[in-house]
Amino acid sequence: MEALILEPSLYTVKAILILDNDGDRLFAKYYDDTYPSVKEQKAFEKNIFNKTHRTDSEIALLEGLTVVYKSSIDLYFYVIGSSYENELMLMAVLNCLFDSLSQMLRKNVEKRALLENMEGLFLAVDEIVDGGVILESDPQQVVHRVALRGEDVPLTEQTVSQVLQSAKEQIKWSLLR
């Protein structure tokens, strides 16, 4: 019961994983220290893959965690939450990630296309979940925000690194004139 008190009241995820059809990691983002070392993370990922890759279900309970998953051609997508997390919210995150990638990759959600567009994957995951807290579940909004990152974004919506990069570009162009 104490764990419930310590957890935030917002919907959260513990990890988002994408594995290939051999169970090898293509993308992994852990939001807490349930598995603090890379060795423990990879062992957990192999365990998940071995339990889920032969079944058609969408949810599993493993090591006290709720795992929702989906496969596409040669990829396996996983969203992991605590055992008391709302499974529908975890599935909403999974569907949002998959649908966002499907739109970004023009419905070609497979390993090669994903590896060629990893920056889009990182941006999409950051738009959907921040620090484990679910921010967005609408794939249209995610795709729109990811597309904005490549265009001129208003100064109020930019990160510090984006502002510095923009300032460097402006200074460079003013010196070249």
From Swiss-Prot:
Could you tell me which InterPro entries the record lists for this protein? AP_mu_sigma_su, Clathrin_sm-chain_CS, Coatomer_zeta, Longin-like_dom_sf
Q: What keywords are annotated for this sequence in UniProt?
A: Acetylation, Cytoplasm, Cytoplasmic vesicle, ER-Golgi transport, Golgi apparatus, Membrane, Protein transport, Transport
Gene3D superfamilies in the record: 3.30.450.60
Does this entry carry the keyword Amino-acid biosynthesis? no
Which residues does the record list as N-acetylmethionine (modified residue)? 1
Keyword Protein transport attached: yes
Q: Which biological process terms from the Gene Ontology are attached to this UniProt entry?
A: intra-Golgi vesicle-mediated transport; intracellular protein transport; retrograde vesicle-mediated transport, Golgi to endoplasmic reticulum
Taking the first listed entry, what is the main subcellular location of this protein, grouped into a coarse class? Answer: cytoplasm
GO CC, one annotated term: Golgi membrane
CDD domains associated with the record: Zeta-COP (cd14829)
Membrane topology reported for the UniProt record:
Peripheral membrane protein
Provide the protein's localization.
Cytoplasm; Golgi apparatus membrane; Cytoplasmic vesicle, COPI-coated vesicle membrane
The entry assigns this protein to a family as follows: Belongs to the adaptor complexes small subunit family.
Q: How does it assemble?
A: Oligomeric complex that consists of at least the alpha, beta, beta', gamma, delta, epsilon and zeta subunits.
Functional summary from the UniProt entry: The coatomer is a cytosolic protein complex that binds to dilysine motifs and reversibly associates with Golgi non-clathrin-coated vesicles, which further mediate biosynthetic protein transport from the ER, via the Golgi up to the trans Golgi network. Coatomer complex is required for budding from Golgi membranes, and is essential for the retrograde Golgi-to-ER transport of dilysine-tagged proteins. The zeta subunit may be involved in regulating the coat assembly and, hence, the rate of biosynthetic protein transport due to its association-dissociation properties with the coatomer complex.
Q: What is this protein called in UniProt?
A: Coatomer subunit zeta-1
Q: Which organism is it from?
A: Homo sapiens
Phylogenetic classification of the source organism: Eukaryota, Metazoa, Chordata, Craniata, Vertebrata
The coding gene here is COPZ1
